[in-house]
Amino acid sequence: MKPYLLEHEELKELSAKIGGWRIMTNHIEREFNFSNFVEAFSFMTKIALICEKHNHHPNWENVYSKVIIKLSTHDLGGITNLDQTIASEINDIFEK
């Protein structure tokens, strides 16, 4: 998939497509909470595999049972269709 920057109208519609994610100036972000560190780290491991598949990696942090993920496409300087795709796949993992 060749990434392209999302246009203003696409960004406005993005929240409905990837529930739970906040649209920021140059990235999207979401906080995920789990009951313990093992669950949080397991979630991160699953995400790592998706990101490797797309060769697109998040900025993220993990503090005990909380994971915060930020997605953007640095090469293009903003939010792209690839960020949207990965956010959607992350949501699917979280909801399972």
Curated annotation (Swiss-Prot):
It holds the Pfam family Pterin_4a. It catalyses: (4aS,6R)-4a-hydroxy-L-erythro-5,6,7,8-tetrahydrobiopterin = (6R)-L-erythro-6,7-dihydrobiopterin + H2O. Coiled coil: none annotated. One of its GO terms (molecular function) is 4-alpha-hydroxytetrahydrobiopterin dehydratase activity. Its EC number is 4.2.1.96. One of its GO terms (biological process) is tetrahydrobiopterin biosynthetic process. InterPro entries: PCD_sf, Pterin_deHydtase. Keywords: Lyase. The keyword Translocase does not apply. Gene3D superfamilies: Transcriptional coactivator/pterin dehydratase. NCBIfam families: PRK00823.1-3. PANTHER family: PTERIN-4-ALPHA-CARBINOLAMINE DEHYDRATASE. Belongs to the pterin-4-alpha-carbinolamine dehydratase family. This is Putative pterin-4-alpha-carbinolamine dehydratase.
